[in-house]
Amino acid sequence: MDNILQVDHLYKSFDDKAVLNDICLSIRPGEIFGLLGPSGSGKTTLINILTGQIKKDGGDITYFGANRNQFASDVYRSMGLALDVSSLYDRLTCYQNLSIYAEIFNVEKQRILTALEYVNLINDAKTRVSKLSKGMRQRLLIARAILHEPKIIFLDEPTSDLDPLNTLEIHKLILSLQQQGTAIFMTTHKMDEAMKLCNNIALLNNSVIAEYGNPSEICQKYNLENKLRIVLHNGEIVELNNDAESMKIISEYYANGQIRAVHSSESDLKEVFLSVVKKGKSNEI
């Protein structure tokens, strides 16, 4: 199966300082790829390069088997962007926000209703964005991204500042898109989120990829259990693997109002990240 996206030895610098150095990664159809890193590690720069918003200084970017030194219209049409809720128009309704992009991509109006229904905002089609909650805005951003049925969607910290219930809703949307064969490239600060959703992850540190691979393999490398512990209202504790399959079970518990709390191995995973950062610093000495 050909990769949707292939990045080889990508390089970018600002003021003669490398912010991305020898970046290599690939994404297959239906894959969820997670990019993690501390502030200033280059996550935003990388996603801006991959979406054609800024130029690279070196290396190759290949979409659908063709090298893209310049982004053609077919590449832009193949990608959906859900990067910043501030790009939504507060004074316009949900429907009007999507109508603008329907015109740009020459999409039938029926697709607007389909996209709103997909993200469970069909009853808010006439609601102004300024009246939406953070979770609803994020879902509208995803609706806009899928409007033209792209092959790959870029998400920038899609659950940042969201409560657990809204986070779960976004996770379900991401997994649903994956099941349809859509590739997802997402940045996140949440290690447990990356472990739960992603097929592969990369940790950026000091302008380079310090860790890359399957989340389970990384857990094994650092001797992590990667478990979820679900505390139910009846006092029962359910232990699950922290992966996409467990999302279905958790969704059922939430739907039945049974969950009191969810505990993950996030603190342990943060230790992994810190050890990677420390490793990078020791290599500089």
PLM regions: where:
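Helix-to-loop junction immediately C-terminal to a conserved catalytic motif
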Residues: 51
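Conserved ABC transporter NBD signature motif
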Residues: 59-70, 74-75
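Conserved ABC ATPase "signature" region
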Residues: 99, 103, 109-124
